[in-house]
Each structure stands twice: as C-alpha cells, then as structure tokens.
Amino acid sequence: MKIISTILLCCTISIYVQAQNNLDKVFDSTAVTHTKVRDTYKSTRIVQGQSSEMLRKHELDFRVAHRFGDAAGEFGGTKTFFGTDNSTDIRIAFEYGISDNLMVGISRSKGSGDLQQLYEGLVKYRLLQQTTDNLVPVSLALFGNMVISGMPSGTDITSAAYFADGSDRMMYVTQAIISKKFADKLSLTLVPSYVHRNHVAYMDMNNMFALGAAGRLKLSKRLGLLAEYYYPFRTRESKDYFKSQKGITFYNPLGLGLEIETGGHVFSITFTNSTAILENQFIPETTSTWLQGQFRWGFNISRRFTLFGKKDWKK
C-alpha cells in the first residue's frame, strides 16, 4: 500500500510540475512585447521631403543631393544631354543623431529661384514609433529648419532677393511626419507642412500651408520604389497675379525615385518637376510641370558613420 501511495504521489507531483511549466509557457507566449517597427524607410528622406526615420545615437550621415536640368521639353532633350549639362540645385549636408529620437543637421545648398547660396540648420524629433502589435499604430516625427541666404541683395524692392536687413534673408519650415508601415512591403506617409518666408516677392505669400503624401514599395531586400507629392495651399489671388502679370504658373511638386541600399550607403535616383531641393523652396516655388517635359532626374547619396560608439566611450 505504501508503495502504491508513493507511486501516486510521485505521479501527482510530476503532473503538477508539467502543468505549471505549460501554464508558464502560455503566459510567456501571450505577453505583449510592443516590438518597434524598423525601416519604414531606408533613409531620413524619401524623394525630396523628410521621412519619419531617424539617425541612431552617435550616427553621422553625410548626404549629397543633386538635381539636373529639364530632361525633355524646350530646354531638355539631346542638346543638353537630357538635362545633365545643367544643374538646378546641389545640396551637401552633415546630419547627426544625438539620440535615437533626436537628430540635428547643417547643410549648404546652391538654391533655386530668386534665393541662392542657402545655409540650413535643421532638427527632427520622433515622438512616436509604430509597434508591431499596433499598440502604437503610426510613427510621428516633428521636423523644423531655418534657412538663410548668403547671396548679395538685389536692387528691385519687389523681388524676394531684395534684403532690407538680415531677417529678410531667412525662411523656415515646420512639419509633422506621420508614417505607417503595412506588413513588410508598403510604407505610407502624410506630411502636414507650414512654410514661412520673412520676405517674398510682391503678391507672394509669407505664410503657406501644404500637405504632403509619400510612399515606399519594397521591391527586394535592397530595392524600393518611392513616390512623393505635395499640395501647397496658395491663394487664388496670388496664382492669378503671377500668371497674368509675370507669366508664372505654380505647380504641385511630384517626385518618383528608385532607392538602392548597399551596406552603409543609400543611393536614390529621383525624377521630379521641382528644381529646388529644400522644402523652403520646392513647396511654394515649383513652376515646372511634368506635362511639358519639365522634369529632371537627380540623385541622393547617404553615407552613414558611427561615432563615439561603446568602445570609444570605454576608452
């Protein structure tokens, strides 16, 4: 009898232990981890505008962007080798990740339009990062920059290039960047934007709101197709004045791109109707249209370096 009791007791203990182990596994498997979504985009920029992606802490990003002349139309074609003989804008930038959610940068651009020789300071802060369980359904980043022109002042007081004082040289952009990655193939973004220019041409707008939309379609591990569109809310009065008095028609910026990732490099081939690179200019000042062949190809190159890593801190 004692032997039977002992056997039953051992079996009971064994069953209890096994049941407890299985229960622990169930609770562990149902625990919410809130894993953050990575690589909504491969770069901090999409075609022209900002993405919600950030540089990692202590990461330095050296960026070069170039836009050529019209690929087709009156000023393109074979006579300019499809725009490669000309350059509408060039930008060189250094951007740095202070933390995983905060980055700053400086840049110098050729500029396009009335204002040229542009120096930029920028900051971007990520408030939210999407999680795989949709506890946080979207990523949200705030972007702002300040740009100042270093060119000599013009003499026409009705021109944007006439500077009565130093503040007339300055312009600003503020954006909220809202992104969502769907599965592993598709990323979409909305970008409510505000552009302020201290001094503008007669009948132009100092303050302008715009709404941007962009997306990325993953083609392979290293290839992605990009698209980007901005709708500036320019007043009808301003549009009519520039069209009737100066023969200038404003168009909405539309860009397409092919993104290639190779190790620490991200290389993008772009096609866009805007001549400028900075948001301060391409949002309010695009006067070229795809329908007349006034689009240009260009490229963005990003090369990242890690500074002050863990090994450096230990030293």
Where are these regions (language model features)?
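Bacterial Sec-dependent N-terminal signal peptides
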Residues: 1-23
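A mid-sequence, solvent-exposed acidic-amphipathic segment
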Residues: 16, 190-236
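Transmembrane beta-barrel domains of Gram-negative outer membranes and organellar outer membranes
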Residues: 20-152, 157-163, 170-174, 179-190, ...
